[in-house]
Curated annotation (Swiss-Prot):
Job description of the protein: Nerve growth factor is important for the development and maintenance of the sympathetic and sensory nervous systems. It stimulates division and differentiation of sympathetic and embryonic sensory neurons as well as basal forebrain cholinergic neurons in the brain. Its relevance in the snake venom is not clear. However, it has been shown to inhibit metalloproteinase-dependent proteolysis of platelet glycoprotein Ib alpha, suggesting a metalloproteinase inhibition to prevent metalloprotease autodigestion and/or protection against prey proteases.
SMART domains: NGF (SM00140)
An individual GO BP term: cell surface receptor protein tyrosine kinase signaling pathway
Subcellular location: Secreted
Disulphide bridges: C139-C203, C181-C231, C191-C233
Keywords on record: Cleavage on pair of basic residues, Disulfide bond, Growth factor, Lipid-binding, Metalloenzyme inhibitor, Metalloprotease inhibitor, Protease inhibitor, Secreted, Signal, Toxin
GO molecular function, one term: nerve growth factor receptor binding
Transferase recorded as keyword: no
Family label: Belongs to the NGF-beta family.
Protein name, entry field: Venom nerve growth factor
Top-level lineage group: Eukaryota
Length: 239
């Protein structure tokens, strides 16, 4: 009987000694598990914070298309600004497509695709004035709507002209109606109809100032710029 008791006691002690003592078998919520969880959470939080800081210091590069669209969208103009009379000019127009050649309006305009198309159709239907065969211009000129990227302002400085403008979430182009000489010498002697035996003559393009939307740093501002507006004959008496 005593031998049986000794055998059971020895087996019990061997079982206790052989039991695993690793922290993996510690019950959930014990101090060892809490320390491991806190350490793991702290390391994870620190890793996320470091990742965010790295992303902020090294932002992902933007695509070229995104940068191009951003440069257009950054310049947003309030349409009320154009209602002021001092900013209106018959030679400046904002449109989504090239406007017709006829310049029949006397103020700054905003044309969308449909309006510009209707204006083009109306311009084609207009009857051109018929001149008598004996009437001819002293100088031949050509008129057209153009866009500009740079121009000379009233102070003689070269400025950047805003081509695309965001108005009411729609991109418009800024057009200028220019008139220039087709040829400085429409006839071999110079201007047409000038007595070349007494006068020297030639045709030249003259300019005037109009208000245009320009860029000054990152700000859009109004400036007077020079554009071609007429073709005139210059004469001088022969000596």
């Amino acid at each position: 009987m005593s031998m049986l008791c000794y055998t059971l006691i020895i087996a019990f002690l061997i079982g206790i000694w052989a039991a695993p003592k690793s922290e993996d078998n510690v019950p959930l919520g014990s101090p060892a598990t809490s320390d491991l969880s806190d350490t793991s959470c702290a390391q994870t939080h620190e890793g996320l914070k470091t990742s965010r800081n790295t992303d902020q210091r090294h932002p992902a590069p933007k695509k070229a298309d995104d940068q191009e669209l951003g440069s257009v969208a950054n310049i947003i103009v309030d349409p009320k600004l154009f209602q002021k009379r001092q900013f209106q000019s018959p030679r400046v127009l904002f449109s989504t497509q090239p406007p017709p050649l006829s310049r029949d309006e006397q103020s700054v305009e905003f044309l969308d695709n449909e309006d510009a198309l209707n204006r083009n159709i109306q311009a084609k239907r207009q009857n051109h004035p018929v001149h008598d065969l004996g009437e001819q211009s002293v100088c031949d000129s050509i008129s057209e709507w153009v866009t500009k990227t740079t121009a000379t302002d009233i102070k003689g400085n070269t400025v950047t002209v805003k081509v695309d403008v965001n108005l009411n979430n729609q991109v418009y182009k800024q057009y200028f109606f220019e008139t220039k000489c087709r040829n400085p010498n429409p006839v071999p002697s110079g201007c047409r109809g000038i007595d070349s035996s007494h006068w020297n003559s030639y045709c030249t393009t003259t300019q005037t100032f109009v208000r245009a939307l320009t860029m000054e740093g990152n700000q859009a501002s109004w400036r007077f710029i020079r554009i071609d507006t007429a073709c005139v004959c210059v004469i001088s008496k022969k000596t």
